[in-house]
Amino acid sequence: RPEAEPVLLLSLPRQLTNIPPYAACLGVSDDGHPLLIRLPSPDVAHILIAGATGSGKTELMRVILASLALTHRQSQLQIVLIDPKQRGLAPLAGLRHLLAPLASTPEQSLALLERCITEMERRDHEGRSTPRIIIAVDELLDLIATGGKAVEAALTRIAQRGREAGLHLLAGAQKPSSAALGSMLKANFPVRLVGRVGSVEDARVAAGVS
């Protein structure tokens, strides 16, 4: 838009007469209509948001999570927050939908991921997928760098098998290359939302075409 205008999150659901289950708001289109993304869709499942510092990727993560919390009860939706820097997702730490307190250390994060895997396996056995669990990870590369192979393996397992059990990853990263993420984990993010990056090559890496 020639002139940027603020968009109030609370106003977006009011513009819709019927919001599909587990549909999150991304913002508005050029003509002012709400943009939605439905997590259970086969071509969605997990979302990777890429962009340089200050590009708004963490703000978009917060919008997605807050919009889901606004339109779903705790019996329908649970949220896991992993934030190594304890800044980006901290404003959501008071949500009643949280499965556990916000995790910031590698040990806390791995314990939460393993708890989610246990739940995923239980659901596979029972054949259920609700309540949906959104696992939000800010600064994904920092988490993998500090948590090592155990954290990467846990994330990859959830990315590969989580959708049918109702588990969805929502992650933010500055430059999500295969070398940094691991090729298997990166391949299991069907949706890539790319903000401002430092170069054309960074954009290609973030979008998964390089």
What are these model-derived regions, one by one?
Residues 12-208:
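P-loop NTPase catalytic phosphate-binding loop
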